[in-house]
Amino acid sequence: MSLINIHNASLSFSNLQILEKSTFHINKNERVCLIGKNGAGKSTLLKIINKKQDLDEGQIIYKKNTTTAYLEQNNPKNLNISIYDFIALGLKEHEKNKKKHTNEIVKIEKIIELIKLNKNTLLSHLSGGLLRKVALGRVLVREPDILLLDEPTNHLDMKTIKWLETFLKKFSGSILFVSHDRNFIQNVSTRIIDLDRGKLVSWPGDYENFIKLKNESYRIEKIQKQLFDKNLEKEEQWIRKGIKARSTRNEGRVKKLKILQKEQKDYKKIEKINNIEINQSKNYLGKIIFKLDNIDFLVNNKIIIKNFSSIIQHGDKLALIGDNGCGKSTLIKIIIGENKPQKGKIYIGKGLKISYFDQNRSFLNPNKSIIENIDYGKEKILLNSREQHIIRYLKNFLFKPNQLKSLVKTLSGGECNRLLLAQLFLKPSNVLILDEPTNDLDLDTLQLLEKIIIAYKGTVIIVSHDKTFIKNTAKKCWFFEKNGFINTHFSQYDSLKKEKNNFHKEKIQKNKSKINLAIKIKNNFKKELNAILYEIETIELDIKTLQKKVNEPDFFKKTLEEKLPTLKMLAQKERKLGKKILFWEKLEKNIINTKI
């Protein structure tokens, strides 16, 4: 039996249909990714499963004694509490009587050890990424059968995302998570459920396979809709000509027409953002946009940036990459003049028009409407010297005319980011600065944003932890190391292996007195590296074969005894792969640190 079964579920808010006679299930040991457009109802579905939202119709059946734990999309707001006490609140017994039983203390200490943070630290002292990690700890302490995670990678840096991927793969229960991080989905999910226009559709396989199948289904749907429209038009022409004789055949045709007209009325068209322009300014002078000479920046005597020099040229597509709190947003503020360095000089090019996407959404007024947040609510806007009605412009960002007077504070995270992009793209610019633009955006909007950045003729500076987004947009990377050092890499971000290799490349110092010995040691490491890479490739092939079996449509219909050997073997191979990768990383580090 499945852990959870949802049957014929329907739910609507005002005119928005969230679920329409939808059915799906979650089996034991599944890691299911819930995908859908912004505002489709993904977070609502998690709340339904967590018993925080009722259905209008249908039923949800839980296997006896099944427990759930829910990680919300937003970080905690009450920050005047220690990490220990916050995680302890995840235990229902602790919430009821506040008694710290030995068993509870062991559970809490175990989670704190897992997230590797000081239990006495107040939440108010943590970054957004660390708050996310602590919120996850509060969920995990309950040891649920099903983890419900809403955008778990938001605010997390690459290192923490990798930690989360590893943890979730080892998690003994089932997971239903919402995410738009394509690399994370590809690495973690065993199945994908798509919430599309009120319907829940289960897709076998991984994310890349899902995209192929989804695009094909859209193509087929469009063809079917064209044939439907032609048939409807034909029947309506027939009825307009008048019915000459009352006959059973004619009555049947009239009934058929009414059915077709109802289907036409009920049809929900595919909504995609596909017609967005950006207001590009051409009034720039010279090739150099920003020049940084020997920049030092400290906060409370802590070195954030040390002796950094570089040049940003016109047309650069630059990504800033590093852990949370390493100074990426600080450097952006130095570049645009909001922060002054303690040492060094900054040259800013002439004629620059900068559009800045702020991850905190500080440019949106939450107490004003959608339309009031765009060009002061003017009826007509100017886009690349062409006048356009504000309603038409916002329609391109999937905002319907009847919702334009809605206050910004009522919007979802993804809708806020779409509005911020609408605001940003209207402002004439030749420099785009995007600080965490991918948070909460659905996959269609992400892919369109990538196309806009690629086609943009000006300069783009990106801060993001989304590997796929960086790989698809950036042509140049700055890697933030410890102690304020920044390494520049003048080519595309490709993979984590390449990142790690290039991240440390400039550290290698040549030592002529020990060169022969160093070369010999390095060659030995390389031989070991080649051997371990072969083992990794072999294990990955085994995992791929096993995953194909697991992703077969009938696999989860088998009995537990039939499924268990395959699932156990897959888990063993994944654990083995993890160990081999750790050994590979150690060898790479040895090679990098061997000075020649």
Swiss-Prot record:
UniProt source species: Buchnera aphidicola subsp. Acyrthosiphon pisum (strain APS) (Acyrthosiphon pisum symbiotic bacterium)
Molecular function as annotated in GO: ATP binding; ATP hydrolysis activity; DNA binding; ribosome binding
Gene3D superfamilies referenced in this protein's UniProt entry, alphabetically: P-loop containing nucleotide triphosphate hydrolases
Ligand binding (ATP 1): G36, K37, N38, G39, A40, G41, K42, S43
Residue span(s) of domain ABC transporter: 1-222, 290-516
Comment field on protein domains: The C-terminal domain (CTD) helps bind DNA.
Binding-site residues for ATP 2, renumbered to this chain: G322, D323, N324, G325, C326, G327, K328, S329
Top-level enzyme category: hydrolase
InterPro entries associated with the record: AAA+_ATPase, ABC_tran_Xtn, ABC_transporter-like_ATP-bd, ABC_transporter-like_CS, ABCF_ATPase, P-loop_NTPase, Uup
CDD domains in UniProt: ABCF_EF-3 (cd03221)
Keyword list, A-Z: ATP-binding, Cytoplasm, DNA damage, DNA repair, DNA-binding, Hydrolase, Nucleotide-binding, Repeat
Biological role stated in the UniProt entry: Probably plays a role in ribosome assembly or function. May be involved in resolution of branched DNA intermediates that result from template switching in postreplication gaps. Binds DNA and has ATPase activity.
Region spans: C-terminal domain (CTD), binds DNA: 519-596
Homology family: Belongs to the ABC transporter superfamily. ABCF family. Uup subfamily.
GO biological process, one term: DNA repair
Name of this chain's protein: ATP-binding protein Uup
